[in-house]
Amino acid sequence: MDFSFSFMQGIMGNTIQQPPQLIDSANIRQEDAFDNHSDIVEDGGPTPFEATLQQGFQYPPTTEDLPPLTNGYPPSISLYETQTKYPPYNQYPNGSANGFGAVRNFSPTDYYHSEIPNTRPHEILEKPSPPQPPPPPSVPQTVIPKKTGSPEIKLKITKTIQNGRELFESSLCGDLLNEVQASEHTKSKHESRKEKRKKSNRHESSRSEERRSHKIPKLEPEGQNRPNERVDTAPEKPREEPVLKEAIPVQPILSSVPTTETSTGVKFQVGDLVWSKVGTYPWWPCMVSSDPQLEVHSKINTRGAREYHVQFFSNQPERAWVHEKRVREYKGHEQYEELLAEAAKQASNHSEKQKIRKPRPQRERAQWDIGIAHAEKALKMTREERVEQYTFIYIDKQPEEASSQAKKNVTSKTEVKKPRRPRSVLNSQPEQTNAGEVASSQSSTDLRRQSQRRHTSLEEEEPPPVKIAWKTAAARKSLPASITMHKGSLDLQKCNMSPVVKIEQVFALQNATGDGKFIDQFVYSTKGIGNKTEISVRGQDRLIISSPSQRSEKPAQSASSPEATSGSAGPVEKKQQRRSIRTRSESEKSAEVVPKKKIKKEQVETAPQASLKTGLQKGASEISDSCKPLKKRSRASTDVETASCTYRDTSDSDSRGLSDGQVGFGKQVDSPSATADADASDAQSVDSSLSRRGVGTSKKDTVCQVCEKAGDCLVACEGECCRHFHVECLGLTAVPEGHFTCEECETGQHPCFSCKVSGKDVKRCSVSVCGKFYHEACVRKFPTAIFESKGFRCPQHCCSSCSMEKDIHKASKGRMMRCLRCPVAYHVGDACVAAGSVSVSSHILICSNHSKRSSQSAAINVGFCFVCARGLIVQDHSDPMFSSYAYKSHYLLSESNRAELMKLPMIPSSSASKKRCEKGGRLLCCESCPASFHPECLSIDMPEGCWNCNDCKAGKKLHYKQIVWVKLGNYRQVLWWPAEICSPRSVPLNIQGLKHDLGDFPVFFFGSHDYYWVHQGRVFPYVEGDKHFAEGQTSINKTFKKALEEAAKRFQELKAQRESKEALEMERTSRKPPPYKHIKANKVIGKVQVQVADLSEIPRCNCKPGDENPCGLESQCLNRMSQYECHPQVCPAGDRCQNQCFTKRLYPDAEVIKTERRGWGLRTKRSIKKGEFVNEYVGELIDEEECRLRIKRAHENSVTNFYMLTVTKDRIIDAGPKGNYSRFMNHSCNPNCETQKWTVNGDVRVGLFALCDIPAGMELTFNYNLDCLGNGRTVCHCGADNCSGFLGVRPKSACTSAVDEKTKNAKLKKRRKVKAEAKPIHEDYCFQCGDGGELVMCDKKDCPKAYHLLCLNLTQPPHGKWECPWHRCDECGSVAVSFCEFCPHSFCKAHGKGALVPSALEGRLCCSSHDPASPVSPEYWSKIRCKWESQDSGEEVKE
């Protein structure tokens, strides 16, 4: 801040107002300051300030008889200048990009060149003096001395104001300084009212004389509301054009607007391609264009330097005035490196060069690439073609009109204190009274007020409304007339360079007469330098007037006036500023400004009118604002039915703040959509792109299969593939009429979604909306594929993460995010989605499997075996270079450190050594993750070529909120550092902007609390108990110790959260039975066939229709006794037949209950008689092959509940996936129901019938008669007296129970115990290696052998009855007849000749693997122990 300004501000205490234009620099020099915004007024001519006078403005007397200045100021300088509006279109730093100051010492003739009709008077700082009589009225040309004759020092301080706040440095380089004057509201309303009254009386005569000498012209609104416009530019003639010409002096009129030149010294013309440099942003491709307000493309700024108006090539439309020194001719994108080299040469120090050479951030680089693509395309065009193709079109919108002028003219003088809102009243009909009539019919006070707002009179034609850059010129003819504000008001926020649209809440705007018509819209297209704006009215010209009460009660519903929108008035002041004696009162407020907005062509040009809805942008529209040539700013999503565009909010509010009026008017800044955008993260992350879409996401969630971009304007194939395409991606120019079918559906050659090989032998997924095709062999490779009777459900309908937990029901339920390129799907949310995946839409992503890794980003494997030891690395940090970075998890974040380390050799120093593990040897390294293994630990040979571990083969991925070990760099001296994988939306914005690719995810380092992007090759999971991999280290860095403690604590927190979540999930699922599909009849699966008998083959019973209960339980029905159900067309009883329970499904009411120890059960609600039909056991009818396949799959997925019931050899009912209530009936050794096979219409079906009378409320059970296919037995919890203890074991009969009772009683007598001879059951050592431990025992009778699973090369115990390899020939696998008694080698009769020889150990046979003289070592027998078991431990001999 300049000291001269702060000094004057503190001494004078006056409010400093905004300048008439944006000023180049904040370093404003106030030496020799004078009023540099006034106009020279000729005798008898109109004063320029008469164009727009504010409320409370006091007319000064004329200058005919006033003495000249005595304080050294030039006599031509006036204390009052015209009211200047803040330009609605933001320019670069303070109106220019040259970074120079705006106010310097120069002559008035160099500074003033044109007149600004609508300007705003600046305050006049008065030097405090002793109380004296008030001075005489001042004049526009001079500073009036006081009555005492002593001159009064009047200083004019020019101050840069932007976004309603004072600006004292470049908006591209720093935040705005918010310095509000402390003395703004020092005077009370009463004092202000009294002063205004005195001034009014004192200068009444002066004002009357001035009105007689200066006639009030009726100016054309187009001329009035255009700042920076030269007076000599011929405007459209107003009604009183002769008066205006007489009033305008002939000599040049001074103005504060920079001189606009279009001929002399102009290097670039409209349509030329240039590079421009703004602030810290890189050289950006631009096109020279015409300013929509000045209608010129080149001007001389206040320092005499030339500036060019350029529009930037990017995804968002931006424009600015740029200094000529920062503009270069564009010759191609290769020129960028030359510009960097040139800037580097001019750099003063090394740090500046580093900044210049620093890589651009991710978002900025993406936007820059978009701009380069446009520029390269435009480079091939001629200048005229570029102007036609890329020039912005500005859609102008009429704001809400103020109340009628007549109503304002009759207001009393006391209303001077009323808060004033500058506004313009539009009317389709001209005013009936001219200026003279107004002057003669109204009081002087009313005339003064009207002269302030005469540019808003009803006599005026429509002034230029807000210009919004809607499309480029190439699409002006196709601009739809329906793109209008529908019952809404448009509020455009001002930013440092380019306004951004903010669509306010939709309000119904009504005029004073209540016609209820809405705002019409105008379209402006800038045709070139000096050309007038072409206006094409969309719709009818309607007058929209809102009463003052409506605006005062609902300020948020009021549209900004043309005075604020068409001119260059600044944004609303953040705080009300109380003016000096000659300014408005403290109760007056500034009008809300609606700056302009530009929307570039690419956002809407390809979108048809039918799809003009708020949606997701294609391409780089998802990229943050920080990559554009702008600073970050608040943005709110649009609700208007306009072109598809979404904006991302990077902060809750603008860093420069909003004025009170803006916040009150546009509360959509903090709307839900904007809040959702604020939480969004990087475009290349899953959750980030989900959050950015917000309310603009299409429910259909369509993605083009060619370009992989989401959008609403897609063509859907109506064939079997269910895919969507962009019209451009299909090579079409228009949307095809009628039904569209893609080429694959037309030819029938669909590619397999797994192997991508086309052919007709592929099968479609059974899900109707899926549309994916697979080879059957390909889809069977995925454990998440579900095969059904009618086909299969592909893996994209099952969560890959949940399937790893062997919970197939959980994995197949819920909303999925499906990969666009491969058969992978995850549940929506961070819990299941693999870290590093990229979201395309809310339900479509590209998984991390498609990460393209280079040789430089290969996996960094650990130096230990994951099986036998969770490795230990010992290192002494003798190398000072490495020791300084060994415990720094983030050293690669430093560019200098990275460059320093990369100069060193990749071979680790000799100080790093691997601790000898127990087994030693070579390590087998995974190509996808850091895992390493000893081949011996995996029982495999060292493979050739690439190899992936089992987890990577199975598709196991890392997830967010997972604790991991991370290593940055390829050096062993750099430790593996504990970190947590973070969701991209939870990391800071600068971390989101770091360079990363598909498959990368951010991690948070414990201890140092840094972030970085890594991939799976540098990360492996943290396991409870992990400490560090440098236990041999004598000293551990404090940061690393802290990291270990934080990681352990965080791991326990996440573990507790996970366990709590699982407990809640288990509790929730325990309230209802596991999911299944309820069916009423059996469903045939596979090759099973259902037999249907002919009516002639159905037996006929001998029951009569007149019987009491024909075919009932107590009847002598032959069909019932033979378990054959009667047919209604064959049975003599007809409809009264009671032997049709299967067909009619006559089940007693029952309910599913939760039992104490047996899971879910079935309980009857009413009493059931003995023999009564209870239920039919229904499910899927499968054959034996399918049954064994399902059992095998169930074992692999750790499923222990089975619902299979065998009807015949090739007919098995599986009620697991589908069934009825009978599937919940539990087993009991003493059941109350039994299963019976009945023939129903020729087909065999299974029914459950009551074995006894069952009272209401009792659980229904039956005996499973389980056939044990495995060697394990399931414990029975039925609680019956005759319970066998295990399922599949026959329950004890009555005779057996009696014998057991007798034996139990006999034990009470004294007996003499006799030791029974024991016999060996199974050996307690492995027959292969001789060690003990967990052993698998052979099920062959009298075989005592047992084995380790690893010795058998098995990972799980074998299922069913298992025989050890000792009983099979080693050569052919047939039954062995000769055995080696020291190892599992055995031979059949054909291969046993000469294979075995007697040994020296008791003549036992041994194979060639043993020495016959000493087949085993002496220590071998010391390890062998046998398990002995008595034949009858309870047998005792009676004394």
Curated annotation (Swiss-Prot):
Q: What is its main location?
A: nucleus
The family line of this record is: Belongs to the class V-like SAM-binding methyltransferase superfamily. Histone-lysine methyltransferase family. SET2 subfamily.
The family database entries (InterPro entries) matched by this protein are listed as:
AWS_dom, C5HCH, NSD_PHD, PHD2_NSD3, PHD4_NSD3, PHD5_NSD3, PHDvar_NSD, Post-SET_dom
The record places domain PWWP at 270-333, 960-1025
Q: Basic and acidic residues: which segments have biased composition?
A: 202-244, 583-595
Which terms in the GO cellular component ontology are assigned?
Answer: chromosome; nucleus
Q: Say yes or no: keyword ATP-binding present.
A: no
The record places the cross-link (Glycyl lysine isopeptide (Lys-Gly) (interchain with G-Cter in SUMO2)) at 218, 245, 413, 502, 532, 628, 1154
- AWS domain ranges (all copies): 1096-1146
**EC number(s) on file:** 2.1.1.370, 2.1.1.371
Question: Which SMART domains did the record assign?
Answer: AWS, PHD, PostSET, PWWP, SET
Q: Where in the sequence does UniProt note compositional bias of the Low complexity kind?
A: 670-691
UniProt protein name: Histone-lysine N-methyltransferase NSD3
Compositional bias (Basic residues): 187-201
